[in-house]
Amino acid sequence: MIDFEQIIKKYCADNAELYHILMTHSRQVADRALAILAAHPQWVESGEVDPVFVEEAAMLHDVGVVLCNAPKIHCLGTHAYIEHGYLGAEILRQEGLPKHAAVAERHTGTGITMEQIMRENLPIPLQDYSPRTLEEKLICYADKFYSKTKLGQDKPMSKIRQHLWKYGSDTVNRFDEMQALFEPNS
């Protein structure tokens, strides 16, 4: 198991508030992802999902926020918040964690398509940032339930869907597909 806490400390070195927010939020995401995984043991038994990797990647998925300008969550960088996924992927690749980097890169929203980047003129490199693997989708899904501004609170499904509608029906449809896969009875 990698020492995700040390990696987060390294990038939050002089920012105790951000470290606390990032660790708390990421732990919530990891715990939900692992709880969902516990309800689907066939994915672990088949080798399709590695629970150790899921915990590590969930803990590191938002490391890119350290480079963003989001004062409400003590992020004092210069980049737009929407960039945190690909920036986190760059950090994790530098740390020698390419598989973890893919999770960071593909967790924003329900994934960001090239069409969305062009339509919304997003300041991120033009490529498809949709989650591909079951592990990537699981962490992307679990992340939607927690905000970095309201630590300790679960977002209700209705609030998640309402927020995602701002990005179009395709975004909501992808979320609904993930819900059907991971928590079909909720």
Tell me the role of every PLM-derived stretch.
Residues 27, 31, 98, 180-183:
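Generic structural signal for well-ordered, non-transmembrane alpha-helical segments
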